[in-house]
Amino acid sequence: MQAYFDQLDRVRYEGSKSSNPLAFHHYNPDELVLGKRMEEHLRFAACYWHTFCWNGADMFGVGAFNRPWQQPGEALALAKRKADVAFEFFHKLHVPFYCFHDVDVSPEGASLKEYINNFAQMVDVLAGKQEESGVKLLWGTANCFTNPRYGAGAATNPDPEVFSWAATQVVTAMEATHKLGGENYVLWGGREGYETLLNTDLRQEREQLGRFMQMVVEHKHKIGFQGTLLIEPKPQEPTKHQYDYDAATVYGFLKQFGLEKEIKLNIEANHATLAGHSFHHEIATAIALGLFGSVDANRGDAQLGWDTDQFPNSVEENALVMYEILKAGGFTTGGLNFDAKVRRQSTDKYDLFYGHIGAMDTMALALKIAARMIEDGELDKRIAQRYSGWNSELGQQILKGQMSLADLAKYAQEHNLSPVHQSGRQEQLENLVNHYLFDK
């Protein structure tokens, strides 16, 4: 088989002084950071959908890319050609993982029977590609939002037959993920939301979604899948309002249906932007709630109200994200999946490499800066000092439930409390972070 990216052998680390645009300048897989190889810290993955399925179409124009596997032809043959190119790309980019939706890798077909048969054939193809290349599956998922049947959602659809079709896709995709050794299975809401409350029963839809997720957990245990189940929050788009709005909202949902010990979060940077949060906030919130699982690394545009899915390029933003992740012990089954696409005008096939190389260098440099912050320990020290009062006898009695509200009121009066505000020193801390970022 002739190589598609025939002008490139493999992307290699050449260091920061190199001017080669098809080389890594900061990402050195074997470099030790805090005693662990950089590759093991970052656990990079490339996604199938934006990289090999998107044809460059948008709401105002048709497809702009010339991809051989997107031309007319026999669907399964084209899917196999796409897999050839995908694994050539993964190998040449040095990513240890990839991610997919079911219909990214396999033709959907005209019926459930065709869908299942096509997917089974493509799972065998992917298994062979993984064996040959050493690339592993970070996570799989089912696309329960693109087909018109999902216009009113999948699990939240008013029609139980649509709910059942979605269940079939999730069963099939999860079992495929299990067979391929996937380390996680992702559930993204897609169209699990509403356009107008005039035709929506919020309680009914929430109950449906909760039961669907309970069944997903039940099936995971039934088939012996040892990976992590992940929900990916997003506030809107394609629906006006989605039920998995942000990390805190999903936590409340999971608690309501007794799922908080079973499902974690896959946090996407651009979705945080759409929810009015920083990426840093959503990562820190997921960690604080005990739900952190994995990351879709990309960026949005603060001036635009939609999911632009650009490649991450801000070391400043991602250094703080990696700092939170390192403090929490790093990834376990999760990783950094590049849920990002080249721009519509980026029509050269090697633009796919430029986007990923820049993103991988960005995250590698962010990791090294975060490691310096961890080793120095000054930020943690400042936070510990700020909350040190809670280690006092009074603070501990409050936290351990040894004092009631009335007890505290009595204590405050008896001790004539007159606390004085202590500076938060935000400006000083921002200068400290800039020191880590810019001072060698």
Curated annotation (Swiss-Prot):
Mg(2+) 2 binds at E268, H271, D307, D309. The gene is xylA. InterPro entries: Xyl_isomerase-like_sf, Xylose_isom_bac, Xylose_isomerase. The active site is at H101, D104. It is an enzyme of class 5 (isomerase). PROSITE patterns: XYLOSE_ISOMERASE. HAMAP family: Xylose_isom_A (MF_00455). It comes from the Bacteria. Mg(2+) 1 binds at E232, E268, D296, D339. GO terms for molecular function: magnesium ion binding; xylose isomerase activity. Signal peptide: none annotated. Homotetramer. Belongs to the xylose isomerase family. It is found in: Cytoplasm. SUPFAM superfamilies: Xylose isomerase-like. This is Xylose isomerase. Its EC number is 5.3.1.5. Keywords: Carbohydrate metabolism, Cytoplasm, Isomerase, Magnesium, Metal-binding, Xylose metabolism. One of its GO terms (biological process) is D-xylose metabolic process. Its main location: cytoplasm. It comes from Escherichia coli O17:K52:H18 (strain UMN026 / ExPEC). GO terms for cellular component: cytoplasm. Gene3D superfamilies: Divalent-metal-dependent TIM barrel enzymes. The lineage of its organism: Bacteria, Pseudomonadati, Pseudomonadota, Gammaproteobacteria, Enterobacterales. Its cofactor is Mg(2+). Binds 2 magnesium ions per subunit. It catalyses: alpha-D-xylose = alpha-D-xylulofuranose.
